[in-house]
Amino acid sequence: VTPEDLLGRDPVAPISTLMEKNTTGKVVMISGAGGSIGSELCRQILYLNPRSLVLFETSEYALYRIEAELKDLAQRTCIPVEIVPILGSVQHPKRLKAAIAAYEVQTIYHAAAYKHVPLVEENVIEGIRNNVFGTLEIATAAKRQGVESFILISTDKAVRPTNVMGATKRIAELVCQALASEPSDTVFSMVRFGNVLGSSGSVIQLFRSEIESGGPLTVTHRDVTRYFMTIPEAAQLVIQAGAMAKGGDVFVLDMGQPVKIMDLAISMVRLHGLQPYFVDGAAHSQGAKEPPRTDGDSGELEQGDIPICVTGLRKGEKLYEELLVGNNPAPTQHPRIMTASETSLTMVQLMPVLERLLAACKAQDIQTIRRIFNDLPLEYSPSNPHLADLIWNKSPQTVLAAPQLVK
């Protein structure tokens, strides 16, 4: 079963001139180069004949794997591209500045982020440091070094966020919007998309693993829906949207209709040549080896090979997701890419709030972090009313060292 089998719509075709504008013959850096989206960006950009590909990644193993894959791909396709593997964190400004300057980077795709909703919900401070201040560091370094184009990979979870991950990505957008409002040689833009089929930790990987182990498939709610795209589609959207940017743009993809996760689970089971049936989710969550079968409130799926159970929404999880803030999407030259009209702040307005946020992270002051989320134009409406960091829960008086804010 491939992700394309489950998409439920035609993939979005790329426009070659947009794909080439910021990549062909350019020095391109990808942060988070070893991740699901970052690695696909690397593959797509390699085929577009960049001068150099600078892979910036904090995970040694992920960097090793993507470097080896790209070098093999370049050799097999006879593409003369320099591939530069750099270990580093986006939270380290000196390392970022040195890498950008040394290789005279022209385009940056910022894909490095903590993205898993439940993990970030319980590791609030590190989520903020990486997603907010990591973005501030790399975006500021790009501006100072005269990078031509900076594209932030964002998410539909940044729209009226109900979880910490979404809130941090919306603040990252505010950072890029604020930098775009100032005189600069760098064109800043943001690209939002929904869930990526087959990416690290995606529902497809989860369901495939659950099917292989005999089930049950775990669905958090019968009515939960998500927008989806394939990994190549997501990478192509990022590349093309960045090429259309004028500065401060928020791009979104027309992803068709949202997909019901329950329907996705049923389809995956059937595409494996099996039949699904429902079991009691409460009994499963209590550790029952053989939870009782149910009719799924539909009178159907009482008999089958693979069980499906409903486990309840996770911390910070939305039932439905939106791709746009407001009701004024504007078209672009790509028929399936639009721009969203978003509230923004200047750096003069934003920096004092970020200073407060950094101080709250250093002090592990979760309550102040919550207030700052409410003060910023995020439309933050947490589904989890008890925001708490796992370490803060155990030692609320402990103060951790944090990187200094860019001045």
Model features per residue range: what roles?
Residues 110, 114-117, 121-173, 178-179:
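Conserved Rossmann-fold NAD(P)-dependent oxidoreductase catalytic core, especially the SDR/UDP-sugar
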Residues 85, 127, 188-191:
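Hydrophobic/aromatic anchor residues within beta-strands of the central parallel beta-sheet
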Residues 1-27, 143:
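Flexible, Lys/Arg-rich cytosolic regulatory linkers and terminal tails that connect or flank
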Residues 13, 17-22, 174, 178-195, ...:
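Strand-loop microenvironment adjacent to phosphate/nucleotide-handling motifs in alpha/beta enzyme folds
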Residues 28-46:
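N-terminal Rossmann NAD(P)H-binding glycine-rich loop of SDR-like oxidoreductase domains
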